[in-house]
Amino acid sequence: MTRAHTLGFPRIGAKRELKFALESYWRGETTQAELIATGKSLRERHWQAQRTAGVNLLPVGDFAWYDQVLGTSLLVDAVPARHRHGDTDLDTLFRVARGRAPTGPSAAAAEMTKWFNTNYHYLVPEFSRDQRFKLGWSQLFDEVEEAKALGLPVKAVLLGPVSYLWLGKEKESGFSRLELLDRLLIVYQEILAKLAAQGVEWVQIDEPALALDLPDEWRLAYLNAYERLSGPCKLLLTTYFGSVAHQRDIITSLKVDGLHLDLVAAPEQLETLVPHLPAQWVLSAGVINGRNVWRANLAKLAPTLKALKEKLGERLWVASSCSLLHSPVDLTLEHELDPQTRSWFAFALQKCYELGLLSDYLDGGDLDKITAYSQPLVDRESDSRVHKKAVQSRLASLTNSDFDRQSAYPVRAQAQRNDLKLPLLPTTTIGSFPQTSEIRVLRQEWRAGRIDDSAYEAGIQAQIKDAIERQEAIGLDVLVHGEAERNDMVEYFGELLDGFAITRFGWVQSYGSRCVKPPVITTDIDRPTPMTLEWTKFAQSLTDKPVKGMLTGPVTILCWSFPREDVSREQSALQIGLAIRDEVADLEAAGIKIIQIDEPAIREGLPLRKQDHQAYLDWAVRAFRLSASPVVDSTQIHTHMCYSDFNLIIEAVAALDADVITIETSRSQMQLLEAFERFNYPNEIGPGVYDIHSPNVPSQGWIEDLIRKAAKQIPADRLWVNPDCGLKTRGWEETEAALKVMVNATKALRTELA
């Protein structure tokens, strides 16, 4: 029997049950026991659903209450001292992630950053020279017992020790976290021994760092690690998000029992690696895309897999390319999608069914079944809705001048100072304000047809008026309309641009209880009508202060959507860039003097290997500049980025040529600014001065210290003051309190820094 397995399954539930259970517990409305019961129910449901769909080896240990890296930190007892309070439990985990929990003292949350090149996030492990590890939280072992009690075929899932250390950060200078490997391996040996004692045969040990360009000392660390971990259980070395062919010499020397390859992200590595695999190894072929919603063309996969089956026999497994965490749960809930469009898609459960089909086929099943399943994708190739001549013609007619502003930044900066007359250290926010229950109910009533368009418009205008009044009372210098009309910064534009499909239950986890519902790019993209103009004009009519027009940039819309698989990402980005360009021109024509084009995802789109970086950055920068360039010098273009390590992309960030960039820096204590200082970044910067992901309200002294730190690296006349990110997920009480502190801190420092 050909083993069919997934690397992980979405935790949140088809209707976001985990999200609502977490938030209820955090609000004190339910008990920890009730939350734990919800998690157990979801795990059982998901295991059984995968089994029914055709998966015959189930992932156990992929469930996480916040993220799997944080879960690993608790497993090996790598909990920062400030978050400890009695025994390690769920509240310990939430204190690390959120800065506070229903029990225990509040403390600064751990730093959060992107999981490789995805829109998923993890809490960065913190390491010190005297770090000690021990067997800690028992969640993994408890879940193995749960699955075995149900009689299910178990494959334990464990983040590998080298990748775990790689994903962390030293909290003191003078040592490398790699020095901690030997101590960590002792605990990993205990983990594997305990899993073996529970009757676990296979452990999926994830080492995604192998897809990166690793320093030699980190590459060699794998040899030491897997020499010591060999024995108790069979180890499936699991890689994803890119090719690991460049690590062939290391990988084929490791004492493991199999290798998983992401053959969606890097199909070419199959020919490079398979001939060199040890004769006894399993090959797990990751052929079903775990990061997209498109139905797999199984008929195209069949010949390659059949040849592998003939060569490897039972040593060939079929799998998702990566965890299905990055895919929505169940397509059968999407009753409102056009049936033809729906026939192009497969969500997590349907991908399990695809694996089952492949497994059956490889074990002698009928090719006709595979061919029939793939037919909707064949039909799509000739669908007239997919390729639009007008869009293609406009792209073909672009010239170099379409990607450039009228003048260089120094000329623009003077024109903007003369026009805007802002004070030193201008204060602003990133864009969104709290999405209250009142706003959500208003949107739900409108979508359900229980209120008409005029009532909805009046309701949103009331929210905008409230946001403007609150900002003026706080004393902010540059205002925003608050985005009450937007359920999501990408989905909103996906609904209004032609070329996207919007799902109802296509939710995926971003971090913790935060879920996003990416639109799906299905055809060529264009803008039938203005998308933000009327709301922004209304907001500006209420105040004499400048109101920023708020747009999401083309690279972020692309990265935070499920992309097409039949055209390049560059092609889609430029199509979106043209649509945003038209919106920018309309906003400027309406008198909006500051326009923000958010690109928080530009770093996450970066390929994992340096050799591929420049090609991506070239088209990403061009797409942004295409969207931002149709304005006069006195119109100020802002952009926002978050969770970014800017060292790799600082030249590209400068090449965007935005007049002002706001970035997320408070959790890293302004360390991210070092890249801008070393590069001598020429334009204006707004480093975030407080962490919006934590509900804690910062002190004025804390913010003043961060502004002073920033002013040592960026001249004060090019410095803005703002929160780290948008405030959509916060409540108004904490939002107003934090912004008042921020404004007061700024006013206190203006004379000092003048």
Swiss-Prot record:
Chain positions recorded as L-methionine binding sites: I430, G431, S432, E483, D598
Cofactor binding annotation: Binds 1 zinc ion per subunit.
Functional pathway: Amino-acid biosynthesis; L-methionine biosynthesis via de novo pathway; L-methionine from L-homocysteine (MetE route): step 1/1
Pfam families noted in UniProt: Meth_synt_1 (PF08267), Meth_synt_2 (PF01717)
Record-annotated active site: H693
GO molecular function, one term: zinc ion binding
EC top class named in words: transferase
Entry keyword set: Amino-acid biosynthesis, Metal-binding, Methionine biosynthesis, Methyltransferase, Repeat, Transferase, Zinc
Record-listed 5-methyltetrahydropteroyltri-L-glutamate binding positions: R16, E17, L18, K19, K114, R514, C515, W560, E604
UniProt GO BP: methionine biosynthetic process; methylation
Binding site for Zn(2+): H640, C642, E664, C725
Highest taxon above the source species: Bacteria
EC numbers: 2.1.1.14
Residue sites binding L-homocysteine per the record: I430, G431, S432, E483, D598
Cofactor: Zn(2+)
Catalytic activity: 5-methyltetrahydropteroyltri-L-glutamate + L-homocysteine = tetrahydropteroyltri-L-glutamate + L-methionine
Keyword Metal-binding in annotation: yes
UniProt function note: Catalyzes the transfer of a methyl group from 5-methyltetrahydrofolate to homocysteine resulting in methionine formation.
Family as reported in the entry's similarity comment: Belongs to the vitamin-B12 independent methionine synthase family.
Protein name, per record: 5-methyltetrahydropteroyltriglutamate--homocysteine methyltransferase
Phylogenetic placement of the source organism: Bacteria, Pseudomonadati, Pseudomonadota, Gammaproteobacteria, Aeromonadales
